Amino acid sequence: MKKYILIITMFITTISFTSFASYSISEYGDVFFEKNADELWPTASIAKVMNVLVALDEVDKNNISLDDEITFDRETIDIKGSHIEVSLNKKYTLRSLLEAELVYSANNAAYAVAKYVGKGSIDNFVELMNKKARKMGLKNTVFYTPAGLPTSITKMPLDVSNAKDLYQIAKYALNDKRILEWSSKKSIEVDGNKYISRNKNLGFYGNIGLKTGFHSISKFNMLAINNINGTNIINITLGDDSANIRFIEQNNLAKNVS
């Protein structure tokens, strides 16, 4: 396996990628391609992966359950950007909201989860996100919001990370079958409405999930897991100029490992 990886690495480092940052690395740490992987960049909605990880920590501690029912207040319903259609004070399971975060990048779901797990406080939840980041040894990752929304909406600084830290987040997520199950879904249904995955690469070149991200400052980001020849490869692209370019760049990284 080591010899195989070396050959591939030597080949793809001659290829040009247009993303601000690109990082292709196996779950075992074998690097296939690296560009600006240490440089800070806004996470955008990739922050939702940490949101889900924190919520699942509380589930695993038996503090909450995936079957717990959560209601939306008016403030949360009105969260801008990508969202699911919900009704005031209607109950939605925690499981369905976590799925909505990963599959459809629903900002209102992310804020509802944050308020529920944070016992009514978004700030408390974001501190849990940062506490987990520190515990994971992520020295270049800071969260200010539970969903990765831009300053123009939140009035907070941008959530930031770099490709190497995002690799660690993805590797951690790989150990949780719930995240892999949810992020691999091509669609979900919430309250009778169908929502199609934001990940248009699902099923191509071994793509089995994980999370896209976008706002006007971060541009188009993606944290992907591709199972290639039985090995999980984590491909990270940050700062692409369009959604289409993002998916092409991701496929190019995957193709050069397959």
Where are these regions (language model features)?
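Penicillin-recognizing serine hydrolase domain
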Residues: 19-28, 94, 118-258
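A periodicity- and composition-biased signal for non-globular, repetitive helical segments
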Residues: 8-9, 54, 217
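Active-site-adjacent loops and short helices of periplasmic peptidoglycan-processing enzymes
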Residues: 17-164, 174
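Sec-dependent N-terminal signal peptides
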Residues: 4-13
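Catalytic-site microenvironment of enzymes
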Residues: 4-5, 32, 255-258
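Generic marker of residues within folded, mature protein domains
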Residues: 13, 33, 60-62, 216, ...
